[in-house]
């Protein structure tokens, strides 16, 4: 059980905007594709792409949900132009996040899998909403016992809080249904995976075992052998993902106000990048 004596990190991005801007400038030089660097009229822009990336991460750290409200803090900054250029940075943000995955050593860590809801409207509008009508649907939020319209984010997090990868599905998709595909796409070197009661089932455990992973989930209280099986240390480690999701919610991962698919992806990627960036700065500085 020595691996369960882990050190948690707060994951708040405690860095000045100047340093954040310098980090984003370095990332841009290293990872930005030529199609982005050498597009037309780049010599005429007043605000660099790296500065826009820094501003997006800064907005997430400030916890400001509305991009329109954030743009009002800056004199002469057009919200529509800022929003359009932010969406152009989506491939770069995606590349940076996956590069961080390769640089962070998670060997020996236990992985935790869970999901969180991303509603795109208030519950009263569940059956009248028109946005994302072909890719979102109605799901159930068990923590608040309410039905919502939107998406569900399935995430894999290390036991000390690094978000390794995620997948977005319709709100109605069951947690266990997305697990195998998410593990296939991620290919983590870690072999131990913790989940909640939503991942119970011999079929899922067998599929993951065939892939080389051991899945542990707590038994429900009314199940036979629950007292013996339910290791309280493992259950405590699994619950740490709740704190990680709470911080992702602060970074606006759950409160996504985008009204286009590209905007939705961009804001979710920024939230995850800000979260993992805070992890790396706190751990390696």
Per-range role (PLM):
Residues 1-285:
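Short alpha-helical elements
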């Amino acid at each position: 059980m020595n691996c369960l004596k882990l050190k948690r990190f707060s994951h708040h991005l405690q860095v000045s905007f100047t340093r954040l801007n310098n980090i984003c400038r370095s990332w841009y030089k290293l990872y930005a594709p030529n199609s982005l660097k050498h597009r037309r009229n780049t010599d005429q822009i007043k605000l660099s792409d790296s500065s826009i990336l820094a501003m997006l991460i800064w907005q997430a750290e400030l916890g400001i949900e509305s991009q329109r409200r954030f743009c009002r803090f800056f004199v002469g900054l057009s919200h529509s132009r800022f929003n359009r250029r932010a969406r152009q940075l989506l491939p770069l943000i995606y590349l940076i996040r996956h590069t961080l995955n390769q640089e962070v050593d998670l060997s020996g860590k236990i992985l935790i899998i869970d999901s969180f809801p991303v509603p795109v409207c208030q519950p009263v509008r569940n059956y009248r909403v028109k946005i994302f009508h072909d890719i979102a649907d109605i799901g159930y939020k068990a923590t608040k016992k309410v039905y919502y319209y939107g998406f569900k984010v399935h995430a894999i997090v290390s036991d000390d809080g690094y978000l390794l990868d995620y997948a977005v599905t319709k709100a109605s998709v069951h947690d266990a249904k997305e697990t195998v595909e998410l593990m296939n796409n991620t290919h983590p070197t870690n072999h131990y995976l913790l989940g909640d009661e939503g991942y119970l089932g011999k079929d899922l455990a067998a599929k993951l075992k065939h892939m080389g992973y051991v899945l542990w989930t707590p038994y429900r209280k009314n199940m036979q052998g629950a007292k013996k099986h339910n290791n309280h240390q493992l259950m405590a480690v699994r619950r740490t993902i709740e704190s990680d999701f709470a911080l992702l919610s602060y970074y606006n991962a759950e409160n996504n106000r985008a009204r286009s698919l590209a905007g939705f992806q961009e804001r979710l990627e920024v939230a995850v990048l800000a979260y993992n960036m805070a992890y790396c700065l706190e751990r390696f500085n």
